Amino acid sequence: METSQPHNAESMSQDLSELLKEATKEVHEQAENTPFMKNFQKGQVSLHEFKLVTASLYFIYSALEEEIERNKDNPVYAPVYFPMELHRKAALEKDLEYFYGSNWRAEIPCPEATQKYVERLHVVGKKHPELLVAHAYTRYLGDLSGGQVLKKIAQKALQLPSTGEGLAFFTFDGVSNATKFKQLYRSRMNALEMDHATKKRVLEEAKKAFLLNIQVFEALQKLVSKSQENGHAVQPKAELRTRSVNKSHENSPAAGKESERTSRMQADMLTTSPLVRWLLALGFIATTVAVGLFAM
């Protein structure tokens, strides 16, 4: 017992970014050993699952960024406040409008697990702002690190436009050099004044962020599985609306290209195993976190 306290103190003297990496190592290894981590690279992902995940991300980032704005002048968060470079809400809004149409807010689902994640973010922002950095770091640097790779895979797998529609989430226009920006972010985060007890709480909150993500994935999987048990694929209202619009304009040149793209997407959904498709869709989000934490 006499040697444990000095060792613990020495450990807590490490940079916060390194402590976060070590604290989340186990959950990272678990993610690495799941089937989707390898299969994802094959680009086997369907449009519908991708849309569901994007919708949940919108609710999560809306809550996260609301609390960041609340605490932007608070010394426990202000040094890592980079809204122009990192914030994702506006980008997700663009993606959702592309996928669901102008009425997307009425179309997207918010599962109970997603709402639980949202509620935790609000509790942290309002009552424990010193823990907000745990959520920001695991999300933003993960998205930034893995974003470009995932963008290319999604673009090819879903046959999305080369101009980037539907992929705004993965595009960080405010970051010209990702490596240098991550170095800046880590240095700012490591400079946050934080005692040992607070550091421990931040590390626990980072692990909790991973668990909340997993719960969201499980909830979305149940949503899809329930539909499959009923013997039909989930049909979002927006997809039905798109078909109706396309039918009324089927003779236009633009409609021809859109019809061809839609057909390819539907073929992709039919030829890929439902289980594999879902695991891969979850991989988009889990991979961004894992890559972000362990590729720096």
From Swiss-Prot:
Looking at the UniProt entry, the stretches that span the membrane are: 274-296
Give the residue ranges for region: Disordered: 231-264
Q: How is it modified after translation?
A: A soluble form arises by proteolytic removal of the membrane anchor.
Important for catalytic activity (site feature) positions: D143
Asked if the keyword Heme belongs to this entry, the reply reads yes
Task: Give the main location.
Answer: endoplasmic reticulum
Keywords of the record: Endoplasmic reticulum, Heme, Iron, Membrane, Metal-binding, Oxidoreductase, Transmembrane, Transmembrane helix
Activity regulation description: Inhibited by metalloporphyrins in the following order of decreasing potency: tin mesoporphyrin > tin protoporphyrin > zinc protoporphyrin > manganese protoporphyrin > cobalt protoporphyrin.
- Please state which protein family the record places this protein in: Belongs to the heme oxygenase family.
* Organism, as annotated: Gallus gallus (Chicken)
Tell me what reaction this enzyme catalyses: heme b + 3 reduced [NADPH--hemoprotein reductase] + 3 O2 = biliverdin IXalpha + CO + Fe(2+) + 3 oxidized [NADPH--hemoprotein reductase] + 3 H2O + H(+)
Q: What protein name is recorded for this chain?
A: Heme oxygenase 1
Oligomeric state and interaction partners are given as: Homodimer and higher order homooligomer. Oligomerization is crucial for its stability and function in the endoplasmic reticulum.
